[in-house]
């Protein structure tokens, strides 16, 4: 066998005898190496070494980026054919020496899954009232009282075998249990679901193996870190997943080849060895996966997110697949992996999976929504599900026969996959009834499932399951029994490398934080400047305030760590579930790499402030202060990271973080001295990091020699100051404090690690179900199905299209010589791209006409969405050239927004309103006022019925991928929201992506109905079935680079398109029953252009079709005789008052249904006030010394500042979510920015009032303030205005920053100024005159002024203040500058702050747009 291989190898793979001899010598050299080196050495081409050809011996672990790229390019030039050849060569090599691929047979018997749902009366909406009831019910449940719950069956007694070496397709309508089945089989089912039955891999139960490492589950949700590139994401996954059995297989193959004297193909040997080495930072397998999934073109592009430009949606979907298949697992469970991909790309991916399954004997189980016929034909087996049951599980060739036996037949031009998903639907089954002479009665899913089990195929499955799997036949490397693929030290290195990369990518955040810290330090040192600070008891109080302020600044500087941690948790939980790495390997790098950051920032603060403020000028004490501040900063970021891991969501974590900050402040011993705290609460002082910082810093300063001057009381000045604050400790407490801070850091990081290890993903929440829905599921399901008109097997228009007509003006849109450029990304410049601009659209000319439904198609990255954005005026960056006209007149964006609709690909909606409310809101704002309200409501209900949303009209929209509507329901809602606006021109970006065949047909029928009324409709579309594709009238086809290669009619059965391309020499003819959309994309691909040496764009530009289109564009670019340009009396459909009312209505509903935001802050205010009330119990009237007054002022200062901070931080996340929705609505011309902003501002008022009332009701009796009506009123007023300021500050910050993270960092700068200039740390008379103006523009200073002036400004009780006897009122005037006779002026100034912030918010919302398109 060896000699025959060598001879054939010589003939086929070596150019001449000399080369063969040289290779033989080089191979002999490799074979003489020790085993370890031999498995890492191979022959590769001499790339880039002059003109010298041949091969060289290299270590495959040291291949450079260019060598890896050229090696893959040589192996795979044309993906479909060359990938097949590569896999076959690998298989032949292994078979030659008798080595087999490992394989896995997956069995599941009588599998069932149930979910425990809470049953609620009425609508299952998370209102504030319902949430309060849930809290009460949870408490009852803990006490043993049974609550109203029901178990809902997701899967019911399903059985089957997923065989290796076969490609299996999972089909079924949304909600039938497909995802649950895939998760169950892959061992990734949520813990809160009850699972029964048996699942086995090669006869081993899931509890005997590690299913997450034996198989790979690929989710339908694309969760990735936005700051990493495509290549980095896949490389990290490859590194964590390891190489599995590849190393052992390679070792065995190499050993047997050496024993047999066989010389392998050098390219195959190099490839196999390179992908068999574990732990590499850069893997050749990554280059291979990038190539076969078409991601090589965006390998160095950042993934991006909604607010950061990155790869496209289709590329993200492929990246999700790539991230998992780069690993070594032999069983793949893939959930809707082709959503958002064009049919050609989808076909290519399925083809590659088929090759992997057939040649490497892999087990591949794929769920798809709309598989095109050619993709469907690639599968070997079909699993059809409905209502949690299996209707069919067997060979693809037999599925139609099964349904024919059941009395149903697939029409001639109907895709089989579409037929299978519709024939099990009660609404659509009748149209496929085979026996036309007999009446049709619905054949239920139960009946079909039982009939399948009675057939021979079903009996064979039962028979196979009854026989135990022969475990002795299992390949030793098939199953994984280890939780992790690499040694934990290697996984730790991988995680620390990624964390360092992310820190570099987020350098702006850290630079901004440092700049902010420097600014705060400059303010602090110039406020507390040494030239104004004497060594006496009064200024000793200022020194103490300054030390305390330093700890607070460094504490607040850790807040951004909370938001950055929360943002990455979803990716962490995904990778943790897939056993990429242990939680500690993720947690420790996040901790260790922040040490230099804490060191640097605390050093900057100490260096800037220490000598300028005038602390004791001894280097030893400078160093000791720096060490305490370093420990404080490191403890702070550890604490906030810990909070983020426990509370997981942005709003909850921010609320908890604010509460912890408040607790650390109040128990720090500054606002209330330790000696004045109630005895049973003093423990809070000793578990507080700020307390230890305060002790360490004060002992370090006030025990210095310069503070040892004896006082009349025979106590040193330093001891007197320490005693007044309850901090009279000896010097050894410095080291105790430093040790305690470092100990707390260890505790926080330990809790952080434990939380990551044991807490579930934040997406796992308890489901709710209404009593009506439960009754329907349990017994009256069939009766609840409305008698809707069935879908025909083709997309037909409604018999009465006129019912969709509301007054509108048909409009034509023409565009000529359209070009679009963007600045070249930095990543491309680094790859040698020298142009300044990157062209995404090139010389696009065309027209879209009324009543004509146009499809805009092209492969991923061809510029389809870009063209829509340019035409719709939605691009916020880049450079546009060319001319766009509307019915002959140049497009004016303001008026165009009134007559156009845009269905975005990303389905952005307000999460807290229902489906029907979303439509009513859109209709009310976008339909003209001449249409009366009754007609609008009827039209809304008509659209609900047309898009088949009436059954879920009361469902909450929810957050995509987390709660609320499913993907296909959200897509239909996106379409409905635009249709209900009755536009003349509608742009739809992939309206059928994410929908199953039936839902796609529903949407397209609605779109066709609307087009028939005379509207102009353009849709980008990726994977159309034959019937959806042929529902369009015209087609615009783009190639990569944004160049047009076809624009014209489709023709009957796509005849015009087929004829055009088949007339081009060399283009392959379309096969019978083949999808024209897929064929068209295949024959115009880049590989075909290269093979035929032609440019389809150039051919189109030289064609008669192009000339005819150009003439048509010229004709349509001229206005009709007597026509006039679009003109409206006002910019928006509704007047300002109607806009405000509509926005206020929606926001009021959203707030009422957002308990995570509103209930959290209301609860936070109550708990904070209660804790302060306990700690400062009855201190309000115990005013004997200035310290007693400071204590009471400290209580109000703490509540004013920290309740406000909590409001601001928790509001940021909520406002950012709504801002994304606002961008979409503003682009649609729904309202003015001022109407939206005012509605947002007004909606806050009742909730702020509730918080303020809570504050007064709790604080007043507990602290014991003077309880007259005027004093209570002014206290309520002061807190109300203060909280308005903080909430409106959050709105303002969101309006001026690009994302939540930057806003979170910027807010801490405001908090710093609000703190230092509040008049508590340093009273107004002591603030230097160059800074006193800042006191006047700080709202917290006026809040404290109003509160204390009203409360104590008229109290003439005498007190001992710094050794003098004064009245309370005179001390407030002299020390703080608070005047009782200026109450009204103070009140007016205070209310001006929220008004100013709200006005700035409205201004910047209108002027700034951070959405990059």
From Swiss-Prot:
Ligand binding (ATP 1): 172-179
Induction cue: Induced by 2,4-D, but repressed by cycloheximide (CHX).
Subcellular location: Membrane
Alphabetical list of SMART domains matching this protein: AAA
Gene: ABCG33
Gene3D superfamilies documented for this protein: P-loop containing nucleotide triphosphate hydrolases (3.40.50.300)
Residue ranges annotated for the ABC transmembrane type-2 domain, each copy included: 490-702, 1138-1352
PROSITE patterns: ABC_TRANSPORTER_2
Family to which the UniProt record says this protein belongs: Belongs to the ABC transporter superfamily. ABCG family. PDR (TC 3.A.1.205) subfamily.
UniProt keyword list: ATP-binding, Membrane, Nucleotide-binding, Repeat, Transmembrane, Transmembrane helix, Transport
Naturally occurring in which organism (per UniProt): Arabidopsis thaliana (Mouse-ear cress)
Cysteine pairings via disulfide bonds: none
GO function terms (MF aspect): ABC-type transporter activity; ATP binding; ATP hydrolysis activity
Protein name stated in the entry: ABC transporter G family member 33
């Amino acid at each position: 066998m060896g000699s025959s291989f060598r001879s054939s190898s010589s003939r086929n793979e070596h150019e001449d005898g000399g080369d063969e001899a040289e290779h033989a010598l080089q191979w002999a050299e490799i074979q003489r190496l020790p085993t370890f080196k031999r498995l890492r050495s191979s022959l590769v081409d001499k790339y880039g070494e002059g003109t010298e050809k041949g091969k060289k011996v290299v270590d495959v672990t040291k291949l450079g980026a260019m060598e890896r790229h050229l090696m893959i390019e040589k192996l795979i030039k044309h993906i479909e054919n060359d990938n097949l050849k590569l896999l076959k060569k690998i298989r032949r090599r292994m078979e030659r020496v008798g080595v087999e691929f490992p394989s896995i047979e997956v069995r599941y018997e009588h599998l069932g899954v149930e979910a425990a749902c809470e049953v609620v009366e009425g609508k299952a909406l998370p209102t504030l009232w319902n949430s309060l009831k849930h809290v009460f019910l949870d408490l009852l449940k803990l006490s043993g009282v049974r609550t109203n719950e029901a178990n809902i069956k997701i899967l019911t007694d399903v059985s089957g075998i997923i065989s290796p070496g076969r490609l299996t397709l999972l089909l079924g309508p949304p909600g039938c249990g497909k995802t649950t089945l895939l998760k169950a089989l892959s061992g990734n089912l949520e813990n809160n679901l009850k699972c029964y039955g048996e699942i086995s891999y090669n006869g081993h139960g899931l509890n005997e193996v590690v299913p997450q490492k034996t198989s790979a589950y690929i989710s339908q949700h694309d969760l990735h870190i936005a700051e990493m590139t495509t290549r980095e994401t896949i490389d990290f996954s490859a590194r964590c997943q390891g190489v599995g059995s590849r190393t052992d297989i390679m070792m065995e193959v190499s050993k047997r080849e050496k024993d047999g004297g066989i010389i392998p193909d050098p390219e195959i040997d190099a490839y196999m060895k390179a992908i068999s080495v574990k732990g590499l930072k850069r893997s050749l397998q990554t280059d291979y996966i990038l190539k076969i999934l078409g991601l090589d073109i965006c390998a160095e592009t950042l993934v991006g997110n909604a607010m950061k430009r990155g790869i496209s949606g289709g590329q993200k979907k492929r990246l999700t697949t790539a991230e998992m298949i780069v690993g070594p697992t032999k069983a793949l469970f893939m959930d809707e992996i082709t959503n958002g991909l064009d049919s050609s790309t989808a076909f290519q991916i399925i083809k590659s999976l088929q090759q992997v399954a057939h040649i490497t004997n892999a087990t591949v189980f794929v769920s798809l929504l709309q598989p095109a016929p050619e993709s469907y034909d690639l599968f070997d087996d079909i699993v059809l599900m409905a209502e949690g049951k299996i209707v069919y599980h067997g060979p693809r060739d037999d599925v139609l026969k099964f349904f024919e036996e059941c009395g149903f037949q697939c029409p001639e031009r109907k895709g089989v996959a579409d037929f299978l998903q519709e024939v099990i639907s009660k609404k659509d089954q009748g149209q496929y009834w085979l026996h036309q002479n007999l009446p049709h009665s619905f054949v239920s899913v139960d009946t079909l499932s039982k009939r399948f089990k009675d057939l021979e195929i079903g009996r064979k499955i039962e028979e196979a399951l009854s026989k135990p799997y022969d475990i002795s036949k299992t390949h030793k490397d098939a199953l994984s029994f280890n939780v992790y693929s690499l040694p934990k030290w290697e996984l730790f290195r991988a995680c620390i490398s990624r964390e360092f990369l992310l820190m570099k990518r987020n350098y702006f955040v850290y630079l901004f934080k440092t700049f902010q810290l420097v600014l705060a330090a400059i303010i602090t040192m110039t406020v507390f400047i040494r030239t104004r600070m004497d060594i006496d008891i009064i200024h000793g109080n200022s020194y103490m305030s300054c030390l305390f302020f330093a700890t607070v600044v460094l504490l607040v500087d850790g807040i951004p760590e909370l938001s950055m941690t929360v943002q990455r948790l979803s990716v962490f939980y995904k990778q943790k579930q897939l056993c990429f790495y242990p939680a500690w390997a993720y947690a420790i790098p996040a901790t260790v790499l922040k040490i230099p950051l804490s060191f640097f920032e605390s050093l900057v603060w100490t260096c800037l402030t220490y000598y300028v403020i005038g602390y004791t000028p001894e280097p030893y004490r400078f160093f000791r202060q720096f060490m305490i501040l370093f420990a404080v900063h490191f403890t702070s970021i550890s604490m906030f990271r810990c909070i983020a891991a426990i509370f997981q969501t942005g709003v909850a974590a921010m609320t908890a973080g604010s509460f912890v900050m408040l607790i650390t402040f109040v128990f720090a011993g500054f606002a209330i001295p330790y000696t004045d705290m109630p005895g049973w609460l003093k423990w809070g002082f000793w578990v507080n990091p700020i307390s230890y910082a305060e002790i360490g810093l004060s002992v370090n300063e006030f025990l210095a020699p310069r503070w040892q001057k004896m006082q009349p009381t025979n106590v040193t000045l330093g001891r007197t100051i320490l005693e007044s604050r309850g901090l009279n400790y000896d010097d050894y407490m410095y080291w105790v404090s430093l040790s305690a801070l470092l100990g707390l850091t260890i505790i926080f990081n330990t809790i952080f690690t434990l939380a990551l290890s044991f807490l579930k993903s934040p997406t796992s929440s308890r489901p709710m179900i209404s009593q009506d829905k439960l009754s329907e599921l349990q017994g009256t399901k069939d009766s609840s199905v409305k008698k809707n008109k069935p879908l025909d097997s083709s997309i037909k228009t409604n018999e009465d299209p006129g019912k969709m007509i509301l007054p509108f003006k048909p409009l034509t849109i023409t565009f000529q010589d359209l070009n679009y450029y963007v600045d070249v990304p930095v990543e491309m410049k680094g790859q040698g791209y020298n142009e300044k601009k990157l062209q995404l659209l090139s010389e696009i000319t065309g027209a879209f006409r009324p009543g004509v439904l146009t499809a805009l198609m092209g492969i991923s990255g061809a510029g389809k969405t870009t063209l829509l954005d340019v035409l719709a005026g939605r691009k916020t960056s880049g450079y546009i050239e060319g001319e766009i006209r509307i019915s002959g007149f140049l497009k004016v964006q303001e008026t165009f927004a009134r007559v156009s609709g845009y269905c975005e690909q990303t389905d952005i909606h307000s999460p807290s309103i229902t489906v029907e409310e979303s439509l009513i809101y859109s209709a009310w704002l976008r339909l003209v006022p001449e249409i009366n309200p009754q007609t609008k409501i009827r039209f809304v209900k008509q659209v609900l019925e047309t898009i088949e949303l009436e059954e879920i009209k009361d469902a909450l929209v929810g957050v995509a991928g987390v709660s609320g509507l499913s993907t296909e329901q959200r897509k239909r809602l996106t379409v409905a929201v635009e249709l209900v606006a009755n536009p003349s021109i509608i742009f739809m970006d992939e309206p059928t992506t994410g929908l199953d065949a039936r839902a796609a047909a529903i949407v397209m029928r609605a779109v066709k109905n609307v087009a028939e009324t005379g509207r102009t409709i353009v849709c980008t579309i990726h994977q159309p079935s034959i019937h959806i594709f042929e529902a369009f009238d015209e087609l615009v086809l783009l190639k990569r680079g944004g160049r047009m290669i076809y624009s014209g009619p489709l023709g009957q059965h796509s005849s015009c398109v087929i004829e055009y391309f088949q007339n081009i020499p060399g283009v392959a003819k379309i096969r019978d029953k083949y999808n024209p959309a897929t064929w068209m994309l295949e024959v115009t691909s880049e590989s075909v252009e290269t093979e035929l040496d032609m440019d389809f764009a150039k051919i189109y530009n030289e064609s008669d079709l192009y000339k005819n289109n150009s003439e048509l564009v010229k004709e349509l670019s001229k206005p009709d005789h007597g026509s006039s340009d679009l003109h409206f009396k006002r910019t928006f459909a509704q007047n300002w008052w109607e806009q405000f009312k509509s926005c206020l209505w929606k926001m009021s509903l959203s707030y009422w249904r957002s308990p995570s935001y509103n209930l959290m802050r209301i609860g936070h205010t109550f708990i904070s006030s209660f804790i302060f009330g306990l700690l400062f119990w009855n201190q309000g009237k115990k005013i004997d010394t200035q310290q007693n007054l400071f204590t009471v002022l400290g209580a109000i200062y703490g509540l004013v500042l920290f309740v406000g901070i909590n409001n601001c931080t928790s509001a940021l996340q909520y406002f950012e979510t709504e801002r994304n929705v606002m961008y979409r609505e503003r682009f649609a011309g729904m309202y003015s920015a001022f109407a939206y902003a005012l509605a947002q501002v007004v909606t806050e008022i009742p909730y702020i009032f509730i918080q303020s009332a809570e504050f007064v009701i709790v604080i007043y009796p507990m602290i014991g303030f003077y309880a007259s009506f005027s004093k209570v009123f002014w206290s309520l007023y002061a807190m109300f205005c203060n909280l308005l300021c903080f909430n409106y500050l959050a709105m303002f910050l969101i309006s001026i920053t690009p994302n939540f993270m930057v806003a979170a960092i910027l807010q801490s700068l405001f908090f710093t100024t609000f703190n230092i200039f509040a008049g508590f740390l340093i009273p107004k008379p002591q603030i230097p005159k160059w800074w006193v103006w800042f006191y006047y523009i700080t709202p917290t200073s006026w809040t404290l002024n109003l509160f204390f002036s009203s409360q104590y400004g008229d109290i003439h009780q005498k007190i001992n203040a710094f050794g003098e006897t004064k009245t309370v009122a005179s001390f407030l005037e002299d020390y703080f500058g608070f005047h009782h006779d200026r109450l009204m002026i103070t009140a007016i100034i205070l209310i001006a702050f929220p008004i100013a912030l709200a006005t700035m918010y409205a201004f910047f919302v209108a002027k700034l747009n951070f959405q990059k398109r």
